[in-house]
């Protein structure tokens, strides 16, 4: 209330609408005055200043001024108490100043309705004490209490701590004791002050579902005021019964459930000094449970699962009924949960680049001392690309993909000559060979091999097989110009034990292999078409390509073993499949998938616009491949390269001659090591025996022998050019020396006439001079897939 005058007499006329327009009324009351002479005058848009001496004994007259943010009160000797009702409705108040007044008491809940208060100045009043509860919950930046006759007691111990810790500017003030001599308030003077000590006792160490749990809260301390339990997390987890009072409070949890696990049971107590609380968690044991979800493709494939149980269950995976041994490629990963108050754990069985061999039934077993559970799910990551009978006639009948193409689909003759088959198929499997180069050279571990051979640390350059494989490395590498003379491949390829530590090469009995005829010959030996029995469970026999090692030296056997280990690991629908080896007797044999239509370069030429000219009178395909079919071919090669890049393999000899074509226009990366003999003009001999495919190499590989996944991207751009020229040789009009000059000077191959601009843009993205600026194989594959699914309308207006 205002002393001596009512609100109306001071110009505080409340509008009929209520208290919400108090500030508006205050501002209007003084708007026309040169200087305000009322008890309280507005300051700025949302402030109020009350300085007329002795005019206020309470602040309740301000209730309802909802937009008030700053209140300044001075020289009000009759204002002695501040209760929580006084500031009701002032929810926006941020600064409160009451100075040089008669304030003696501030209620512990005085600021309940002003949660945004950040500046509090109560200096030069008659305060002897101030409860810690008064400022609890406020985000104070400044608290000023100087000039008050504070009485040193435990009730101000919190203020002493604030002064010691430098909080809210308290340490910058001079606080006085109300005792004689006007002494300073000493820091830590009363060492007997302290917050209550709270302990919770729980005699039940082992609790199961349905049990009753007894807890007791013991409280110690001076001037105890209140104590109680906080049980907000226990709703539905148990029936609660409370009993007792200070200093000992009891709690019974009746018929507990598993939901009680990891829920906090809290006991708190207060005194003049402050508040203390302690929490415990009751562990309720219950059997394991498990749930499995369907496999989801993420960065790695994920088979999601959820497991529950207390104690936390142990986990074990089965694959098709057998124990699944986890590796760096197949592993369990738990997901971090934002919820910390539950026992259920969520996670994934991660599979890095799974293939059809990983298709099957996955079972998760969970067990703890109170029970076990299991759940199973079928997962199919990739279709099996080998489900066909290789002895059946294989017509090249393509479904037209390009809706705008008018060309007829090519059809293959059933009666192919053995030599035609040999060349077509022969080049099919050595993807394996070039893939291994990296391994041949590098094993310095000297361990006993699975073939009974001691591995040397370095391969000699004379080894024919080493030379046939030296175009495949792990990661990036660089070769010296003298490679192929005396240095061999020493030091250029390091073995990654991650890939080969547990490689299991399949051994095939020699009696199950029946050679039919020779397909071709490379530096390593000969390649044969053969029948193989008992190779697959669902077939008695099947056609395969067999590579025979002609040299039986220790080094050659070493290379043979290393290559077999590498090829066993590579499993992808667009990498030629390796079935295993035969080491009984001699010669050593490798067994590969049979690709009937041979290498991609020859296939493109025989299905291109110049097919009749190249055939020399023989029957040819009825028409060139359409745009949709060319895009499908390119997309498949890109898919294989994405797989190799994911394993950090560098191909180093990617070209259409080293890709193979099978039934239904299925294209795979692979050759039998014969391409350097059949396509000798594609290679440039350096030094003694080193042959480099310079027309497919980027500048850094030509100049510095630096090979990386980025150099493979460049080579793929050239492969794309080959596909859309129907197998032409890059820079066919130039010699090797002239081609090197064009590449190193930054010239690019011209856009083929059958190539849409979108595809040529991909080629150019692969041919950026700086390796880091080239497209990634993933990006290339994604773009080609999108184009293959919806081929662009393209008309060769120049043709």
UniProtKB/Swiss-Prot annotation:
Q: Where is this region: Interaction with SQSTM1?
A: 472-493
| Segments forming domain LRRCT | 148-219
Q: Which SMART domains match?
A: TyrKc
| Entry binding sites for ATP | 519-527, 547
Record entry for activity regulation: The pro-survival signaling effect of NTRK1 in neurons requires its endocytosis into signaling early endosomes and its retrograde axonal transport. This is regulated by different proteins including CFL1, RAC1 and SORT1. NTF3 is unable to induce this signaling probably due to the lability of the NTF3-NTRK1 complex in endosomes. SH2D1A inhibits the autophosphorylation of the receptor, and alters the recruitment and activation of downstream effectors and signaling cascades. Regulated by NGFR.
Q: Which GO terms describe its molecular function?
A: ATP binding; GPI-linked ephrin receptor activity; kinase binding; nerve growth factor binding; nerve growth factor receptor activity; neurotrophin p75 receptor binding; protein homodimerization activity; protein tyrosine kinase activity
List the carbohydrate attachment sites: 67, 121, 190, 204, 255, 264, 320, 325, 341, 361, 404
* Superkingdom of the organism of origin: Eukaryota
Q: Which residues form a coiled coil?
A: none
- Cellular location of this protein? Cell membrane; Early endosome membrane; Late endosome membrane; Recycling endosome membrane
Q: Where are the LRR repeats?
A: 90-113, 116-137
Q: Where is the signal peptide?
A: 1-33
Which cysteine pairs are covalently linked by disulfides here? 36-41, 40-50, 154-193, 217-267, 302-348
Q: Which residues form the Ig-like C2-type domain?
A: 196-285, 205-368
Question: What CDD domains does this protein's entry cite?
Answer: IgI_TrKABC_d5 (cd04971)
Q: Which PROSITE patterns match?
A: IG_LIKE, PROTEIN_KINASE_ATP, PROTEIN_KINASE_DOM, PROTEIN_KINASE_TYR, RECEPTOR_TYR_KIN_II
Please list the residues that make up the active site: 653 (proton acceptor)
Which function does this protein serve? Answer: Receptor tyrosine kinase involved in the development and the maturation of the central and peripheral nervous systems through regulation of proliferation, differentiation and survival of sympathetic and nervous neurons. High affinity receptor for NGF which is its primary ligand, it can also bind and be activated by NTF3/neurotrophin-3. However, NTF3 only supports axonal extension through NTRK1 but has no effect on neuron survival. Upon dimeric NGF ligand-binding, undergoes homodimerization, autophosphorylation and activation.
On subunit structure and binding partners, the annotation says: Exists in a dynamic equilibrium between monomeric (low affinity) and dimeric (high affinity) structures. Homodimerization is induced by binding of a NGF dimer. Found in a complex, at least composed of KIDINS220, MAGI2, NTRK1 and RAPGEF2; the complex is mainly formed at late endosomes in a nerve growth factor (NGF)-dependent manner. Interacts with RAPGEF2; the interaction is strengthened after NGF stimulation. Interacts with SQSTM1; bridges NTRK1 to NGFR.
Q: What is known of its domains?
A: The transmembrane domain mediates interaction with KIDINS220.
Name this protein carries in UniProt: High affinity nerve growth factor receptor
Task: Name the species this protein comes from.
Answer: Mus musculus (Mouse)
